[in-house]
Design a protein with these regions (language model features):
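Acidic catalytic/metal-coordinating carboxylates
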Residues: 9, 33-36, 59-65
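Short hydrophobic/Thr-rich beta-strand motif most characteristic of the beta2 strand and flanking loop
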Residues: 25-32, 40
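Active-site beta3 strand of CheY-like receiver
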Residues: 44-50
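Receiver (REC) domain active-site loop signature in two-component systems and cognate sites
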Residues: 55
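C-terminal output helix
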Residues: 105-114
Length: 121
C-alpha cells in the first residue's frame, strides 16, 4: 500500500482529503503545518507528500526544501495551492516540488498526477 502524507492546515480540507485518499486505497497521515509535515516526512518516509504551500509555523515550500535537503528526491512532492499564477508554479518547482495542483482540488486531475508521480518513482 502506498503511503501519502497530506500537509494541509485547514482541518476540514485535510479530513475530507484524507478520507478520499484512504478510500482510494492509500495509507494516509496528516500534518497541520510545515514543521509537522517535515517531522512526519523524515520519520515515516511516505511515497508522496501532498504539500499545501501556505501553512503556519513553516511554509510548505520551506518544508519541501528541508525534505529535499535531508532525503533528496526519494519522496515525491505535489504542491497544493490556491495560487495558479506562473510565479507560484515556478516557486514550487524551485523549492523541489515534483508537480503542482491548484485548490480547490480537482479530484480526478489530482489522482491522475499522483498516479503519474508514483509510477515514475
Amino acid at each position: 500500500m502506498q503511503r501519502i502524507l497530506l500537509a494541509e492546515d485547514h482541518d476540514d480540507n485535510r479530513e475530507m482529503l484524507m478520507r478520499r485518499l484512504t478510500r482510494a486505497g492509500f495509507e494516509v497521515r496528516g500534518a497541520s503545518d510545515g514543521q509537522d509535515a517535515l517531522t512526519h516526512a523524515l520519520a515515516w518516509k511516505p511515497d508522496l507528500v501532498l504539500m499545501d504551500v501556505s501553512m503556519p509555523i513553516m511554509s510548505g515550500l520551506d518544508a519541501t526544501r528541508m525534505i529535499r535537503a535531508k532525503l533528496g528526491a526519494t519522496i515525491k512532492v505535489i504542491a497544493l495551492t490556491a495560487h495558479a499564477m506562473n510565479e507560484s508554479r515556478e516557486a514550487c518547482f524551485e523549492a523541489g516540488c515534483d508537480a503542482f495542483a491548484t485548490k480547490p482540488v480537482d479530484w480526478p486531475n489530482l489522482m491522475e498526477e499522483m498516479n503519474r508521480q508514483l509510477r515514475f518513482w
